[in-house]
Structures are given as C-alpha cells and as structure tokens.
C-alpha cells in the first residue's frame, strides 16, 4: 500500500519551527562522501515536493518562496537518502550533486575558512566552471 506524500511527511515526525513567520526546518545536503554542500530551510511544501520529485526543493526566506535547487543554474540535487535529527527539526540529505552547490560557483557553500584568532576568512577551494 503506497502512502500519499502528506502521510509520508506526517510519519517523519518533524517539528517545523517558526522562522520569520513561516514554519520551517533546517535542511543540510551532503554528497556521498559526507562533504557538506549547503544548508537551507525547508517548508512542509518544499519537503513534499522533494519527496514527490526526488530532487531537492527548499524555501527561500529572502525571496519568500519555494524553489527547486538548480532551477536557474541546472545544478540540481538528486536525493539518495535522508536522516532526521534527534529533535526532528533538521534533516540531513545525501544527494547526487550536478555541477556545484554554491550559487557563488564553489562545490560547497562552506568555502570560507575562518581564522578564530582574527575572525577573518580565507577562501579555500576553487570556483568551478
């Protein structure tokens, strides 16, 4: 018996938090090696769309809308698996990344290494073409 998408999300026992007036949770995406690619917020609707399509959808607080990762760049994230954290307010996705994950052209959004003695950051890694 196949469950509908809303029932699947309900069974995930998630705790969406009130962030900027929206019910959201944190989504972390990693590649198969475990390297963190990016973090973003998800609404219930973006989670449902991700499950339905097999590709990552997020909720942009700055644009106040749902968006499919790669809708402009073509750098999509195909879902391999997902883990829920112990509190139910964050999801960790393993994805197959097409192209780069960061909108600045880096594989990971975490390319700014911070020196804790100065607070200054240095870019590590190269931009991808």
Swiss-Prot record:
Residue numbers binding Zn(2+): 86, 102, 109
So where does Mg(2+) get bound?
A: 85, 87, 89
Question: What is catalysed by this protein?
Answer: 1-(5-phospho-beta-D-ribosyl)-5'-AMP + H2O = 1-(5-phospho-beta-D-ribosyl)-5-[(5-phospho-beta-D-ribosylamino)methylideneamino]imidazole-4-carboxamide
Q: In which pathway does it act?
A: Amino-acid biosynthesis; L-histidine biosynthesis; L-histidine from 5-phospho-alpha-D-ribose 1-diphosphate: step 3/9
Listed Gene3D superfamilies: Phosphoribosyl-AMP cyclohydrolase
Subcellular location, in the record's words?
A: Cytoplasm
Top-level lineage group:
Archaea
Under which main EC class is this enzyme filed? hydrolase
Which InterPro entries does the entry link to?
PRA-CH (IPR026660), PRib_AMP_CycHydrolase_dom (IPR002496), PRib_AMP_CycHydrolase_sf (IPR038019)
Cofactor dependence is on: Mg(2+); Zn(2+)
Its transmembrane ranges are none
Q: Name one GO biological process term.
A: L-histidine biosynthetic process
Molecular functions (GO terms): magnesium ion binding; phosphoribosyl-AMP cyclohydrolase activity; zinc ion binding
What does the entry list under GO cellular component? cytoplasm
Details of cofactor binding:
Binds 1 Mg(2+) ion per subunit.
Q: Which NCBIfam families does this UniProt record tie to the protein?
A: PRK00051.1 (NF000768)
Q: What does this protein do?
A: Catalyzes the hydrolysis of the adenine ring of phosphoribosyl-AMP.
To which protein family does this belong?
Belongs to the PRA-CH family.
Under the heading PANTHER family, the entry gives: HISTIDINE BIOSYNTHESIS BIFUNCTIONAL PROTEIN, HISTIDINE BIOSYNTHESIS BIFUNCTIONAL PROTEIN HIS7
State the oligomer form and interacting partners.
Homodimer.
Identify this protein by name: Phosphoribosyl-AMP cyclohydrolase
Q: What is the lineage of its organism?
A: Archaea, Methanobacteriati, Methanobacteriota, Methanomada group, Methanococci
